[in-house]
Amino acid sequence: MRAVVQRVLEASVTVEGQRVSDIGPGLLVLLGVGKGDTEADVAWMVEKLATLRIFEDAAGKMNLSLEETSRQLIVVSQFTLYGDARKGRRPSFIDAMEPVSAKALYERTCELLRQRGLSVGTGIFAADMKVALVNDGPVTLLLESPGPAAPKG
């Protein structure tokens, strides 16, 4: 499971001209599910997203997490995080999980984040979405669960 995590001042997701999610300060998470990802990858990602200390404390140090700040997040499904463009000119997506199973793990991730008391907005799985954001920092991190879909070596 892969995620691009961006600290934002605000973010929104629009589908077919309708705004489906918006947040103030928090995180925008682009989440990709890879072949072989399991509930263990979901649990790892949820723990990391909830407790990652990337918000500033009173001293200006990145020392606070989503859970500690009560900030919001939007989680957007993004199979293209498994695009491989090393050969040719068109990316291959063969490492992305097939849509039915990927949707289940994506939804489970959002559900477990909510169970931790976090305010979670979402996009619409497999929809053509317009994602708008104002980066804060900018702070952008790449996360990858240690499961079988992670690169070897």
UniProtKB/Swiss-Prot annotation:
Enzyme class per UniProt: hydrolase
Motif window: Gly-cisPro motif, important for rejection of L-amino acids: 137-138
EC number: 3.1.1.96
A single cellular component GO annotation: cytoplasm
CDD domains reported in the protein's UniProt record: Dtyr_deacylase
GO biological process: D-amino acid catabolic process
Gene3D superfamilies: D-tyrosyl-tRNA(Tyr) deacylase (3.50.80.10)
Keywords: Cytoplasm, Hydrolase, RNA-binding, tRNA-binding
Organism of origin: Myxococcus xanthus (strain DK1622)
Subcellular location: Cytoplasm
Domain comment as written in the entry: A Gly-cisPro motif from one monomer fits into the active site of the other monomer to allow specific chiral rejection of L-amino acids.
Molecular function via GO: D-tyrosyl-tRNA(Tyr) deacylase activity; Gly-tRNA(Ala) deacylase activity; Ser(Gly)-tRNA(Ala) hydrolase activity; tRNA binding
Reaction(s) catalysed (UniProt annotation): glycyl-tRNA(Ala) + H2O = tRNA(Ala) + glycine + H(+); a D-aminoacyl-tRNA + H2O = a tRNA + a D-alpha-amino acid + H(+)
Protein name, per record: D-aminoacyl-tRNA deacylase
Function of the protein: An aminoacyl-tRNA editing enzyme that deacylates mischarged D-aminoacyl-tRNAs. Also deacylates mischarged glycyl-tRNA(Ala), protecting cells against glycine mischarging by AlaRS. Acts via tRNA-based rather than protein-based catalysis; rejects L-amino acids rather than detecting D-amino acids in the active site. By recycling D-aminoacyl-tRNA to D-amino acids and free tRNA molecules, this enzyme counteracts the toxicity associated with the formation of D-aminoacyl-tRNA entities in vivo and helps enforce protein L-homochirality.
Pfam families (alphabetical): Tyr_Deacylase (PF02580)
Main location: cytoplasm
Assembly, per entry: Homodimer.
Keyword Hydrolase: yes
Gene: dtd
Family to which the UniProt record says this protein belongs: Belongs to the DTD family.
